[in-house]
A protein has these predicted regions:
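Outer-membrane beta-barrel translocator domains and adjoining extracellular loop/strand segments
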Residues: 14-21, 86-91, 98-100, 141-148, ...
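Surface-exposed extracellular loop regions of Gram-negative outer-membrane beta-barrel proteins
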Residues: 1-47, 53-59, 63, 178-193
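Conserved C-terminal beta-signal and adjacent last beta-strands/turns
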Residues: 63, 71, 77, 113, ...
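Gram-negative outer-membrane beta-barrel transporters
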Residues: 11, 133-137, 146-148, 154-242
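Transmembrane beta-strands of outer-membrane beta-barrel pores
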Residues: 8-14, 76-82, 89-91, 121-123, ...
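Outer-membrane beta-barrel signature, preferentially recognizing the C-terminal barrel domain
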Residues: 34-57, 61, 65, 71, ...
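Transmembrane beta-barrel domains of outer membrane proteins
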Residues: 1, 61-65, 108, 118-122, ...
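Outer-membrane beta-barrel channels and translocator barrels
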Residues: 1, 67-69, 112, 122-126, ...
């Protein structure tokens, strides 16, 4: 079977924004965008940028039945993404991330060409899905640290939105096996790598290798009881760009190296969950679920969490969920 889909999107951004004159000149906007200045207040400029983005998306796929519960799928997708307001206009302290973020009025739309291949096996007891993909993105938009800036509120790292030509490739694995009517085991694993082909550097903020295993026990005769234990293993990201920079410390009149690039160590988490039904009447029941995440109270930091520089992730936590059905 062959499937084809096409979509067109039009985005228009009309905005008014104040820039500090010093920042405007520092970013080189006085040469490229002098025509959008509508008022000059000396230390500040009021500008009125307007951008139009035309986007076309196309997807086509070919599936083939191999017989004996097996099939393969090949897919090609073309997509465009217009930059959002943050990527264009960010210009100051991002309070929730404790960093200064700078957008760029020159940012263009992204164009992605993605090809993928998927193998499926689906039987009464087992399900296996393996997918590999390759994605070439022209004008890939990303956010990267470039230095430090001192303000009256303190010193903050500066992150800037940039664009490069990039490739992303990886694989996903999903497996489920029913041992018997009561026990099921599952595995989900994912791998991904990103490369800046413009300068042959690794991309920032790429997920590391992750594998999750789960064992579930179910007995419908015991008030629809189920219990499961989940193991989540996340490896350390070993492919990352070096964006470290030096910062001046006035108290010691010296420079120190700020290691903003090194990813945190690998970590392993155990999670457990159990649920069952409490019957109230013939038509009413309450589904009770109890779970413990991070059972071993592991100290870890997630590489993609923008607050990982300041604190660990949440430790052991308990939750109870009640669902009333009627």
């Amino acid at each position: 079977a062959i499937d084809i889909g096409v979509r067109y999107d039009f985005n228009r951004i009309n905005a008014k924004k104040f820039y500090q004159t010093s920042r405007w000149i520092e970013r080189g906007y006085n040469d490229d965008f002098s025509d959008i200045i509508i008022e000059d207040f000396g230390t500040q400029l009021l500008v009125k940028p307007s951008f139009d983005f035309h986007s076309v998306s196309l997807s086509t796929g070919l599936s083939y039945d191999l017989g004996k519960n097996r099939s393969i799928l090949f897919n090609y997708g073309l997509s465009n993404r217009a930059p959002n307001a943050s990527e264009l206009f960010s210009d100051g302290l991002h309070h929730s991330a404790a960093r200064i973020e700078l957008g760029d009025l020159r940012i263009l739309k992204e164009t992605s060409n993605r090809i993928s291949g998927t193998y499926n096996y689906d039987s009464e007891k087992a399900t296996i899905t393996v997918e590999g993909f390759f994605n070439h993105i022209h004008n890939f938009i990303y956010l990267e640290p470039t230095g430090v800036e001192t303000t009256i509120r303190g010193s903050f790292p500066v992150w800037e939105y940039k664009q490069v030509n990039a490739i992303l490739f990886g694989a996903d694995l999903n497996m489920r096996y029913e041992i018997n009517r009561k026990f099921v085991v599952q595995n989900k694993s994912s791998f991904m790598k990103g490369k800046d082909v413009s300068s042959n550097r690794d991309l920032i903020d790429i997920p590391s290798l992750k594998t999750t295993n789960l064992v579930r026990f179910t007995n419908k005769k015991w008030s629809n009881f189920s219990a499961e234990i989940q193991s989540e293993l996340v490896f350390r990201q070993r492919n990352f760009p070096n964006n470290n920079f030096e910062a001046y410390i006035p108290r010691t009149d010296s420079f120190i190296l700020v290691d903003i690039s090194s990813p945190p160590p690998a970590y392993h988490l155990l999670n457990v969950r159990s649920d069952f039904d409490l019957k109230i009447s013939k038509k009413e029941n309450v589904r009770v679920a109890f779970s413990i995440n991070n059972l071993l109270n592991t100290s870890y930091r997630e590489n993609l969490n923008r607050l990982r520089y300041f604190a660990d992730e949440i430790g052991r936590n308990f939750s109870i969920q009640l669902i009333y059905n009627y």
